[in-house]
Regions:
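Hydrophobic/small/kink-forming positions within alpha-helical transmembrane segments
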Residues: 13-18, 45, 66, 70-74, ...
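Hydrophobic alpha-helical transmembrane segments in multi-pass integral membrane proteins
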Residues: 44-54, 100-115, 155-170, 218-235, ...
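Flexible, substrate/cofactor-facing loop regions flanked by secondary structure
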Residues: 152-182, 188-192
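Interfacial loop-to-transmembrane junctions
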Residues: 205-207, 251-272
Length: 283
């Protein structure tokens, strides 16, 4: 992984944590994710007007990925409804890197070398440490339905990361791929919200429109950067490096949601930094 690719993934991590924090801050999660999905749909539709059309070989991956992204959004919405940001976000993000490493090795034939493997393992240990501290440090008993939803979110992340890693390479155009992905995945949650809220939906969305659309723009930018990176580096290190967003999420939780950071999170963040350094050793 080159420094430029690593920088792109780190920017994506910051952007991703930011849009997740915006989503969590809107208390009605159905409204929050309707705005983010619907905003992504509008942005993606605009991008299709000038982005190259993805190659035919990419479309099976686009369709599967869109379904996985919808599942991811629904599970993330449920985990944010049931649990605290400082617990749910690291569990969801921390599950993905090791699963992606296995999936990429089995289905894509990308077997990481020793440095990358060590980096993924150490970074993932840091992520798991942050997640466990979120459970134990909160002073609350674990809320298992929320944790299961967060784990399911992580599995969905691993699934679409692997699918998109193959699909974007087959597409010939990362920009066109992300544009059509946003269009395909952006229909489901707004349709579900309309089914649930009917005529009241527009009035309920209006107070949160600016924040929600900002979250949508950040979401598209974050994943576009990741897709570009996946055309230039193996999937597993990108997945692990992307999850440095948990450090940003912990900082956001401390500053804006008044959650404690503490020594355990600092130690876990240190493991993340070591893991990132090991992954970059291969560049």
């Amino acid at each position: 992984m080159t420094p430029l690719v690593a920088l792109a993934v780190l920017i994506a991590a910051i952007t991703h944590a930011s849009w997740n924090a915006i989503a969590h801050a809107i208390k009605d999660q159905l409204l929050s994710f309707t705005l983010i999905s619907g905003g992504g749909l509008l942005i993606g539709a605009a991008m299709t007007l000038f982005a190259p059309f993805p190659a035919a070989a990419a479309w099976p991956y686009l369709l599967v990925s869109a379904a996985l992204h919808v599942a991811y959004m629904m599970l993330l919405m449920r985990s944010f409804t049931l649990g605290d940001f400082g617990q749910m976000y690291p569990i969801a993000r921390g599950t993905a890197p090791l699963v992606v490493t296995v999936l990429a090795a089995v289905f894509v034939g990308e077997r990481p070398d020793g440095w990358a493997t060590a980096g993924v393992a150490v970074a993932s240990a840091g992520l798991v440490g942050l997640a466990l501290w979120g459970i134990r440090g909160s002073g609350k008993r674990p809320h298992w339905p929320a944790i299961v939803a967060a784990l399911g979110t992580g599995l969905a992340i691993a699934g679409y990361t692997t699918v998109d890693g193959v699909g974007v390479r087959a597409s010939g155009t990362p920009l066109g791929y992300v544009a059509w992905l946003m269009v395909l995945e952006g229909l489901a949650i707004p349709a579900y919200a309309y089914y649930r809220r009917r005529a009241e939906l527009v009035a309920q969305l209006r107070p949160f429109a600016v924040r929600g659309l900002l979250g949508a723009a950040l979401s598209v930018a974050a994943y576009g950067l990741v897709l570009w990176a996946q055309t230039r580096a193996p999937l597993a290190p990108i997945a692990a490096l992307r999850e440095s967003s948990i450090i940003v999420g912990a900082a956001i939780g401390t500053l804006f949601f008044k959650e404690r950071f503490g020594a355990p999170r600092i130690a876990a963040a240190g493991l993340m930094v070591v893991g990132i350094g090991l992954m970059l050793h291969t560049s």
